[in-house]
């Protein structure tokens, strides 16, 4: 078994979510309004009870509101928001409770199918609860019986959002304020997996019966070319094919096409649901065995086992007239069908680095 990319293991530092940042800055601004107290840092309690302290970049009054800001620290996670300035503006209001507003750089929901209603600011349920819990606790401590209006902003968020799946999900104008635990765990990719689930939900809610889950840009381009699918029906799954297959147990979209590079599809064929090289490897002896099943002689099998990459193995098989691409897709199809409900029609495409189709299975 060989990995096709080299990964370097090292201790990694956790960070804090945009939801934690919004909670800290909202609390600091509200405290300034109610008590006049201004601090360089603020403590918040995360959903599982851990108390963390977050440094503030500023906290001041501005007209009838207070605003406070902090720099998003995602630790060692490759988060698009790492280093961004997130700030909250808080106003007092007569009505009890907390009203949320999307400020500059925070998106608004424009399509049904997400956990938030159309027209709502893209501040997810757990961050909303974190902010509300902290502000209502502060109100109780201060003897304040009114409510709060909280506007969350992310500097440069509208441009940063173009690097996320928000536009495809129908979240327009900026980023989402996210988090379930309050902590960003490096390479846990929980936000990415959540966006995969959201993409499926949005496509299903909006009446699309055929979705294509793709590992990258080349496979997306292939699906556009083959099926002319709209953006909303293209699910950017990356390495997380398991996130797609398992979610279809809850949301059984009638037709699913899986499309990816030959190497990644060979991992799926071997039963892997995380296709990243950290978690699964190319099994060249298995590729040789599949080639043998469709006529490869001993010399070709040995050449496949000795290949440097799956692409080289595929090229060797192709030169010998052995349809290894189709055979790998067939095994991937069998595995995918074993995970999703029986009523979901599944098909699999494997492509080369240029987007050319090198194998397919389950295609009518």
UniProtKB/Swiss-Prot annotation:
Q: What is this protein called?
A: Cobalt-precorrin-5B C(1)-methyltransferase
Note the NCBIfam families from the entry: cbiD, PRK00075.1-1
- Catalyzed reaction equations: Co-precorrin-5B + S-adenosyl-L-methionine = Co-precorrin-6A + S-adenosyl-L-homocysteine
Q: In which pathway does it act?
A: Cofactor biosynthesis; adenosylcobalamin biosynthesis; cob(II)yrinate a,c-diamide from sirohydrochlorin (anaerobic route): step 6/10
Superkingdom: Bacteria
Instruction: Output the Gene Ontology terms for molecular function.
Output: cobalt-precorrin-5B C1-methyltransferase activity
Transmembrane segment boundaries:
none
Q: Name one GO biological process term.
A: methylation
What keywords tag this UniProt record? Cobalamin biosynthesis, Methyltransferase, S-adenosyl-L-methionine, Transferase
Which Enzyme Commission number(s) are listed?
A: 2.1.1.195
Q: Which family does it belong to?
A: Belongs to the CbiD family.
In its keyword annotation, does this UniProt entry include Methyltransferase?
yes
Stored InterPro entries: CbiD, CbiD_sf
